[in-house]
């Protein structure tokens, strides 16, 4: 059984009225999510979890939080089972970040300010591991690491696990919205080697805009489906069994 269901019912906190995470709280969350000795081997790091949560929130159908947490921690049981205090703190901070993403990606262009614009979480990459001038290894993968690599991979993984993304991906007018995600995940575009991640972060604003545009596209898509599903309304009242026949014969419609 997914233990996150029970935890959420027991700790039902109105996350949406909590203030956005502070820098200190984000640092604390990164630290808790980096506890490789206590967390499952397959658990996501904070950067990847942030990308995964973002894809869930701006995609076709947000994943229920218990299932989302199960995917992030790679287990249906609660993390840090032997330290209830740290467990509580970890889940609280993670769900507040989930709420922060939900709020910032839902803003219209008129509502966005420098203080509330959506920005992905990124972990610092050690200088010795940073990307080099564009080179691929024998597997045609980018050599080195770059900021938001894991974030892009988390977002990409969420898309790959959900076939419901197909309408957006197959739309030639908007399918390119995922291009920044692919670039951050792979470090380069396999179809265009000159398009690559570098150290000037020029793609970061584009990534932010694309993420919010995806949520807007799915909102409009669902509205169009709802409009198409509106049942037919009869233009005139239905003729009753004993009503006069519409042909003006004066006879009853049906005996």
Positions of predicted regions on the chain:
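Acidic/negatively charged segments and metal-coordination signatures
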Residues: 1-255
């Amino acid at each position: 059984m997914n233990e996150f269901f029970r935890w959420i019912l027991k700790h039902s906190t109105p996350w949406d009225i909590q203030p956005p995470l502070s820098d200190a709280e984000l640092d604390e969350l990164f630290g808790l999510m980096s506890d490789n000795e206590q967390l499952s081997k397959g658990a996501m790091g904070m950067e990847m979890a942030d990308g995964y949560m973002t894809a869930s929130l701006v995609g076709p159908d947000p994943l229920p939080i218990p299932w989302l947490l199960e995917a992030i921690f790679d287990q249906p049981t609660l993390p840090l089972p032997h330290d209830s205090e740290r467990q509580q703190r970890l889940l609280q901070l993670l769900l507040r970040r989930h709420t922060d993403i939900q709020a910032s990606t839902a803003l219209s262009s008129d509502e966005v300010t420098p203080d509330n614009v959506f920005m992905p979480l990124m972990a610092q990459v050690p200088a010795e591991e940073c990307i080099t001038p564009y080179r691929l290894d024998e597997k045609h993968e980018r050599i080195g690491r770059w900021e938001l690599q894991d974030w892009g991979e988390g977002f990409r993984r969420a898309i790959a696990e959900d076939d419901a993304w197909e309408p957006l991906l197959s739309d030639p007018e908007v399918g390119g919205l995922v291009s920044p995600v692919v670039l951050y995940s792979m470090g380069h575009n396999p179809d265009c080697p000159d398009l690559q991640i570098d150290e000037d972060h020029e793609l970061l604003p584009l990534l932010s805009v694309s993420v919010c545009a995806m949520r807007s596209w799915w909102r409009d898509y669902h509205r169009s489906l709802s409009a198409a599903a509106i049942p037919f309304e009869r233009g005139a009242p239905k003729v009753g069994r004993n009503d006069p026949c519409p042909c003006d014969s004066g006879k009853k419609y049906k005996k």
